[in-house]
Structures are given as C-alpha cells and as structure tokens.
C-alpha cells in the first residue's frame, strides 16, 4: 500500500510495545504497523486507519500445563498463578475484566520477554493475540512452553479485537491516503490472500467491510 502511495523506502524501527504510541507522537516514526488493537482510549492519542484484521486471544503455558490453565477465568480462580503480558497490551484490560488481580500480572516489554518469564518460572502463562504468539512460539520453539489449543476466549462484550495501522493525529493526510489504498484491497478481496500465508484465515480474521474505526473508537463496536 505504501508503494502505491509513492513511498519507495521504509525504515523499520524497533520499539517496546508500550512505547509505540508515545514514540509515534514524539516523531520517532510515522506510523505503527503492528496490527495494534483499536480501543477508545488509544483513539484519544492516535489516528487509527480503518480496521485491517480481527483476532482472538491465545495462551501459552509451561509445558504440561501444570496449573491447568485454559482461560483467563482459570487464572483468576488460581490466585497463586501469574501471567506475563506486554506493557500497554489490551490483554491487561481483558484479564482484569475477567477477575484476574493486577498483582498476578507480570508486565514485560515484548514477546521474547514474556516467553522468558514463563520459561524461568516468573510467570505460569503468557497471553497475547492468538496467531501472533502462536507463530512466535513456533519460530522460537522452546521446549519449556506450549500453546493452549483449547483456550476459552474471554467474553468481552461479544466483540473480537480489531487491528489497524496507527498514525499521528496531526498526520491525518497520510492516514486518509492509506485508508484509500486499504479500501481498494478490501473491495478486491485481497486481504485474505495477504494474511493466509501467515496463518490467518478469511473466516476468522477478515474484517466485515462495513465496520469502521469510528464505531470502535466511540465504543459502539468495542
């Protein structure tokens, strides 16, 4: 999409997840392409593009799942258990809504740190976007960890999370141009074609074309 906008060179910048929006607004980069979940709170500090993908949550535990964790409710009901989560991730809010005590949450800067927390015993589980953490686990392949295949999705008002690119509020011109290119891909049905090689599916992850970022930011679809 950026090439279609005449942008030939893109320089990537690494950042802790919790520093993405602060870094964006500080001018360290021009857009966030991490599939960040659109939330009403984040909408106050950043200009999201239209939704690109929808997804559920996933859980990774110590091999053998010794604490028998299959849901956020299981973590809440086992007060001795701890869960590692990236700082600033929406999963923290989901966990709290499901009854997990804040003291049970180990905040970490990124996915490798969350895996390390579980492998070292500082946490019993880690959670994040289902396909993201599953793919990360498959690529790192640590014997100490396993993906919970029968994880029960949290009941967060019946809505999945919706991810999108994020732009500075004062750079809506780039956001609007990006949205135009995104709309073309949606109309041509190419989103599934682009995401399926990464393990996503049209059935589970392609967004309803009528869904808008405005409706998520307002809370209507959040």
Locate the predicted segments by residue:
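Extracytoplasmic small-molecule ligand-binding "clamshell" domains
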Residues: 1-35, 44
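Periplasmic-binding protein-like
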Residues: 53-58, 141-179, 202-222
């Amino acid at each position: 999409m950026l090439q279609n906008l005449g942008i030939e060179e893109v320089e990537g910048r690494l950042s802790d997840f919790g520093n993405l929006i602060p870094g964006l607004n500080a001018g360290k980069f021009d857009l966030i392409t991490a599939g960040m979940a659109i939330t009403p709170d984040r909408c106050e500090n950043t200009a999201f593009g239209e939704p690109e993908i929808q997804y559920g949550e996933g859980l990774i535990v110590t091999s053998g799942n010794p604490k028998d964790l299959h849901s956020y409710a299981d973590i809440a009901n086992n007060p001795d258990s701890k869960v590692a989560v990236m700082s600033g991730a929406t999963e923290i809010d989901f966990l709290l809504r499901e009854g997990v005590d804040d003291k049970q949450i180990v905040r970490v800067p990124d996915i490798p740190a969350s895996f390390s927390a579980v492998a070292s015993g500082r946490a019993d589980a880690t959670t994040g976007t289902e396909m993201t953490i599953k793919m990360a686990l498959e690529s790192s392949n640590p014997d100490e960890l396993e993906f919970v295949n029968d994880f029960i999705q949290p009941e967060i008002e019946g809505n999945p999370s919706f991810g999108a690119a994020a732009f500075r509020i004062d750079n809506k011109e780039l956001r609007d141009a990006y949205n135009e290119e995104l709309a073309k891909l949606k109309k041509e049905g190419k989103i599934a074609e682009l995401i399926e090689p990464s393990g996503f599916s049209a059935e589970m992850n392609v967004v309803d074309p009528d869904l808008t970022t405005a409706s998520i930011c307002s809370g209507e679809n959040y």
